[in-house]
Amino acid sequence: MSTLVSLPGATPAAAPDYQSLERPLNFTESAAAKVKSLIQEEGNPDLALRVYIEGGGCSGFQYGFEFDENRAEDDLAVQTSGVTLLVDPLSLQYLMGAEVDYTESLTGAQFVIRNPNAKTTCGCGSSFSM
């Protein structure tokens, strides 16, 4: 189960609306387990997975993932099984209600974003349009 993590010292009245939502983004157990494994390989327990949106790709926007040990004050932080997923407010507006998952199949393994806001996606699933 994912939980929203608030910033230390932040008051609910001062928090942006998205930070007070119960589940603005779903970070699955499968994704958290893979991230935890990758963080252990890196040897830095302060790392979190950051997901972001940037212009590009064949459909106009594309997803990006990176490890980050710096959390901005306005980042959304979602925790699942002790692993943190970070999203900046600009990216979150495109990811509201989305699910970040990790899948393995005969064709390979990958992080997958199931985004209800995307009108179209490319064949590989890494870019989308609104």
From Swiss-Prot:
Positions that bind iron-sulfur cluster: C58, C122, C124
Name of the protein this chain belongs to: Iron-sulfur cluster insertion protein ErpA
Family, per entry: Belongs to the HesB/IscA family.
Cofactor note (record): Binds 1 iron-sulfur cluster per subunit.
Task performed by this protein: Required for insertion of 4Fe-4S clusters for at least IspG.
Subunit comment: Homodimer.
Keyword field: Iron, Iron-sulfur, Metal-binding
GO CC, alphabetical: cytosol
GO molecular function: 2 iron, 2 sulfur cluster binding; 4 iron, 4 sulfur cluster binding; iron ion binding
HAMAP family on file: Fe_S_insert_ErpA
InterPro entries: FeS_biogenesis, FeS_cluster_insertion, FeS_cluster_insertion_CS, FeS_cluster_insertion_RrpA, HesB-like_dom_sf
Cofactor(s) recorded in Swiss-Prot or TrEMBL: iron-sulfur cluster
GO biological process: iron-sulfur cluster assembly
